[in-house]
Amino acid sequence: MATGTDQVVGLGLVALSLIIFTYYTAWVILLPFIDSQHVIHKYFLPRAYAIAIPLAAGHLLLLFVGIFITYVMLKNQNDTKKTQ
Amino acid sequence: MTKLAQWLWALALLGSTWAALTMGALGLELPSSCREVLWPLPAYLLVSAGCYALGTVGYRVATFHDCEDAARELQSQIQEARADLTRRGLRF
């Protein structure tokens, strides 16, 4: 069965994704229709960041995946050399 | 048509619609707030897909369960196979 930690981590991931989705939807979809003098604009970064942040996050993710794959492959190569 | 082709067609259709609307190729005069929503739309779709993926993984982590019946069935099948193989002269 899923233990307590699993449930906490899983529900935390669900909550995180819901928070990100709600905030991003409000930022990108709803904000242009709200008057630009409204107080709510204080709680959001300028609009260019709505693209820049996901782009940077995606690049970081790809970078880390690449580093991980390189590390694992190099390690495997060394291991097979040792056994031969 | 394969699933891949379907997805590619849908993406191409959506992408060309988006490009046409953003570049103003159709000659439509959209209100400025609509245009503000339109240009980050691909990023928005990507982020939504990412959120959905993260949520699915989280939900499955929170609710996964052991398949006890299947484990019992598998154990009994292993026993059966061992007995059968021992009868035919295989030693473990």
Curated annotation (Swiss-Prot), chain A:
It is found in: Endoplasmic reticulum membrane. It is a multi-pass membrane protein. The chain crosses the membrane at residues 11-31, 49-69. InterPro entries: DPM2. It comes from the Eukaryota. Its main location: endoplasmic reticulum. GO terms for molecular function: enzyme regulator activity. The keyword Lyase does not apply. GO terms for biological process: dolichol phosphate mannose biosynthetic process; GPI anchor biosynthetic process; protein glycosylation. Pfam families: DPM2 (PF07297). Pathway: Protein modification; protein glycosylation. One of its GO terms (cellular component) is dolichol-phosphate-mannose synthase complex. Keywords: Endoplasmic reticulum, Membrane, Transmembrane, Transmembrane helix. Component of the dolichol-phosphate mannose (DPM) synthase complex composed of DPM1, DPM2 and DPM3; in the complex interacts directly with DPM3. Component of the glycosylphosphatidylinositol-N-acetylglucosaminyltransferase (GPI-GnT) complex composed at least by PIGA, PIGC, PIGH, PIGP, PIGQ, PIGY and DPM2. Interacts with PIGA, PIGC and PIGQ. Belongs to the DPM2 family. Regulates the biosynthesis of dolichol phosphate-mannose. Regulatory subunit of the dolichol-phosphate mannose (DPM) synthase complex; essential for the ER localization and stable expression of DPM1. Part of the glycosylphosphatidylinositol-N-acetylglucosaminyltransferase (GPI-GnT) complex that catalyzes the transfer of N-acetylglucosamine from UDP-N-acetylglucosamine to phosphatidylinositol and participates in the first step of GPI biosynthesis. May act by regulating the GPI-GNT complex. This is Dolichol phosphate-mannose biosynthesis regulatory protein. It comes from Bos taurus (Bovine).
Curated annotation (Swiss-Prot), chain B:
Pathway: Protein modification; protein glycosylation. InterPro entries: DPM3. The chain crosses the membrane at residues 8-28, 37-57. It comes from the Eukaryota. GO terms for cellular component: dolichol-phosphate-mannose synthase complex; endoplasmic reticulum membrane. It is found in: Endoplasmic reticulum membrane. One of its GO terms (biological process) is regulation of protein stability. It is a multi-pass membrane protein. Keywords: Endoplasmic reticulum, Membrane, Transmembrane, Transmembrane helix. One of its GO terms (molecular function) is enzyme activator activity. Belongs to the DPM3 family. Component of the dolichol-phosphate mannose (DPM) synthase complex composed of DPM1, DPM2 and DPM3; within the complex, associates with DPM1 via its C-terminal domain and with DPM2 via its N-terminal portion. This interaction stabilizes DPM1 protein. Stabilizer subunit of the dolichol-phosphate mannose (DPM) synthase complex; tethers catalytic subunit DPM1 to the endoplasmic reticulum. This is Dolichol-phosphate mannosyltransferase subunit 3.
